[in-house]
Swiss-Prot record:
The modification N-acetylmethionine is found at residue 1. Component of the CMG helicase complex, a hexameric ring of related MCM2-7 subunits stabilized by CDC45 and the tetrameric GINS complex. Associated with ORC2. Interacts with HELB. It comes from Rattus norvegicus. GO terms for biological process: DNA-templated DNA replication; double-strand break repair via break-induced replication; inner cell mass cell proliferation. This is DNA replication complex GINS protein SLD5. Required for initiation of chromosomal DNA replication. Core component of CDC45-MCM-GINS (CMG) helicase, the molecular machine that unwinds template DNA during replication, and around which the replisome is built. Residues 166-223 are annotated as: Important for GINS complex assembly. It is found in: Nucleus; Chromosome.
């Protein structure tokens, strides 16, 4: 794995900002996105560019293996690494699809009200999937139940019928960058808010919504 991949950030005033990653750094980015997505209660920002670059990298690796000598131990090792990367990639994408199916009306509402310039939580393909899933769900409800009900009951509010992500759930995290003055909400009404510092390398169990912005920025890693 010697190729270098280019990612395009979205924080440049003059367009996309190019970030050059080695293959090892690219796979590390994928694994971080996978772990965060796996343990976060909500759908996180789409990492479609990382997914595309990893798929390109897998194609390059496959081409290199086809040219390599058969029976070489290095070929077997590289093929095992390819299978590991494919597993992480497919698990990451499956996890996102499961969240879309579980929270689709809330995800689409968040996307509709997303401020200009704010990263999307859906890739273009995921957005199409979510829209089609909602349309099919509404059609199924109408055909199976709603059409048999009185006219005043033939509507369903999916925003109320489908549960929201539980942002109050607790998550384990590892601190990658030291953070100061993190406001923590109390467990009970009689308690007061308090402030904590998160030291680099430390691990914590904390309510997700308290550190959600730090997950998005990459300052902490869910574990």
């Amino acid at each position: 794995m010697t190729e270098v991949q280019d990612l395009h950030g979205q924080d440049s005033d003059e367009g996309s900002e190019e970030v050059v990653l080695t293959p090892a750094e690219l796979i590390e980015r994928l694994e971080q996105a996978w772990m965060n997505e796996k343990f976060a209660p909500e759908l996180l920002e789409s990492k479609s560019e990382i997914v595309e670059c990893v798929m390109e990298q897998l194609e390059h690796m496959e081409e290199n293996l086809r040219r390599a000598k058969k029976g070489d131990l290095k070929v077997s090792i590289h093929r095992m690494e390819m299978e590991r990367i494919r597993y992480v990639l497919s698990s990451y994408l499956r996890c996102r699809l499961m969240k879309i199916e579980k929270f689709f009306p809330h995800i689409l509402e968040k996307e509709k009200t997303r401020p200009a310039g704010e990263p999307s939580s859906l890739s273009p393909e995921e957005f199409v999937f979510a829209k089609e899933y909602m349309d099919h769900t509404e059609t199924h409800f109408k055909n199976v139940a709603l059409k048999h009900m009185p006219p005043n009951l033939q509507k369903v509010d999916l925003m109320r019928a489908v549960p929201k992500p539980d942002l109050d759930s607790y998550v384990f995290l590892r601190v990658k960058e030291r953070q100061e003055n993190i406001l923590v909400e109390p467990e009970a009404d009689e308690q007061r808010d308090y402030v904590i510092d998160l030291e680099e390398g430390s691990q914590h169990l904390i309510r997700y919504k308290t550190i959600a912005p730090l997950v998005a920025s990459g300052a902490v890693q869910l574990i």
